[in-house]
Design a protein with these regions (language model features):
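Binding-site signature for planar aromatic cofactors or substrates
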Residues: 1-213
Length: 213
């Protein structure tokens, strides 16, 4: 494989993103774009990069799956004792990025992560497939384990412990809602003259500005 990536280019030829056509509410605009991504056949359109940082500002990023979006924010689920869970506990300022490559679209979200209530976490947990509910009991996310065999043996033990459909939610497995302060929509355009609209939360609503590519 070549080490020089300078010639990896693609021309963007999708539709424009114009102020007069964009929704005044960024959540509504996101839902519109998300629905289009689903209809377009984008694989895993709810995959989003979640960036966190320690109290000292050391960054970390990984992909998680969006499970709900509303006026309250963007919701996902994970272990509170994972690296991201510990980082959000000490520094709740986070960022999200969605990239729908087939449509040449990106959405960036900046906000603060808030823990969901136990009732909300339970409600979602109980909708997960049985094996997925068992899997969260196998080990706390991000801890060191000795082998793949350990995981498989633990899964067998947990399955024996909870043979029926009723599987309790571990206290360390929970949900987070990112309450947005800024949301930017990026649409790739010809000649790299991309469209970028930035929504910033203000008292009583959202301010929209256009950014240079």
């Amino acid at each position: 494989m070549a080490d020089d990536f300078s010639d990896l280019r693609q021309e963007y030829r999708h539709v424009a993103l114009l102020e007069q056509e964009a929704d005044a509410n960024p959540v509504a605009q996101f839902k519109d774009w998300f629905g289009q991504a689903v209809d377009y056949g984008v694989p895993l359109p709810n995959a989003m990069a979640l960036a966190t940082a320690t109290r000292d500002g050391k960054p970390n990023v990984r992909f998680v799956l969006l499970k709900d979006v509303s006026e309250q924010g963007f919701t996902f689920y994970t272990h509170s004792v994972s690296v991201k869970g510990r980082e959000m506990a000490e520094n709740p300022d986070v960022a999200l990025v969605f990239y729908w490559t087939q449509m040449h679209r990106q959405v960036r979200v900046e906000g603060r992560a808030h823990l969901l209530s136990d009732e909300e976490a339970d409600a979602y947990f109980n909708t997960r497939p049985h094996d997925s509910r068992l899997a969260v009991w196998v080990a706390d996310q991000s801890v060191e384990i000795e082998s793949r065999e350990y995981l498989e043996n633990r899964m067998a033990e947990i399955a024996e412990q909870y043979p029926g459909e009723s599987v309790p939610r571990p206290a360390t497995w929970t949900g987070y809602r990112v309450v947005p302060e800024r949301i930017e929509f990026w649409q790739g355009r010809e000649s790299r003259l991309h469209d970028r609209l930035l929504y910033t939360r203000e008292e009583g609503g959202w301010n929209i500005v256009r950014l240079a590519p």
